[in-house]
Every structure is written in C-alpha cells, then in structure tokens.
C-alpha cells in the first residue's frame, strides 16, 4: 500500500489523548491494516510506534425532504487509527517532524 494516512484527526477528544497519554489519532484508508499504518508513521515522522489501534466508523444515513419526495443517501464509511508512541516522543502535525521530550 502506498500511503494509508489521509490526515490527522484533530478533535477535542483526540487532543486530550495526545496530552494525557501520548496517543495520536489519524484518519486512514479503509483498506489499511495496522502494520501498514505503523510503517507509514515511522517513515513519515521518524518516531518509534509502540502500538496501533483501529476503529471502523460507519457513515451516517441522511434524508432530505423536497417537493418531489424524500431523497435518501449515506455518508461514506471511514477508518481512524489511534497510535501510541514510545516514551519521550511526539509528533508535530504542522511541520511533519518530530520532537524529543524533556525528561
């Protein structure tokens, strides 16, 4: 697989995971597996990945009421990966580089 990483998933919950546990959340391709994700993060950011957990998220169904009737559709399914790094390592999302922690 070329690059399974799509983008960092920056939410209030994922930011809390980063601050408290040193875990980072990424949106990844649906067909990506844990080993591909681990290799991609280690190559791109130059860090040591301790573990990878993945979550398959189902897309929501949507309805729109119009004069001609009800239009039904569905948002796309997606997948996110929760990545735990080795101690004293971090990822800077904006520059694509890593920083060593003090301690």
Curated annotation (Swiss-Prot):
Entry keywords, A to Z: Ribonucleoprotein, Ribosomal protein, RNA-binding, rRNA-binding
Quick check: keyword Ribonucleoprotein in the entry?
A: yes
Q: Would you name any one GO CC term?
A: ribonucleoprotein complex
Q: Which GO terms describe its molecular function?
A: rRNA binding; structural constituent of ribosome
The question of whether Ribonucleoprotein is a record keyword is answered with yes
The GO annotation for biological process reads: translation
Task: Write down the InterPro entries for this protein, in alphabetical order.
Answer: Nucleotide-bd_a/b_plait_sf, Ribosomal_uL23-like, Ribosomal_uL23/eL15/eS24_sf
Quote the function comment for this protein: One of the early assembly proteins it binds 23S rRNA. One of the proteins that surrounds the polypeptide exit tunnel on the outside of the ribosome. Forms the main docking site for trigger factor binding to the ribosome.
Family indicated by similarity: Belongs to the universal ribosomal protein uL23 family.
Entries under HAMAP family matching the protein: Ribosomal_uL23_B
Subunit info here reads: Part of the 50S ribosomal subunit. Contacts protein L29, and trigger factor when it is bound to the ribosome.
What name appears for this protein in its UniProt entry?
Answer: Large ribosomal subunit protein uL23
In the UniProt record, the gene name given for this protein reads rplW
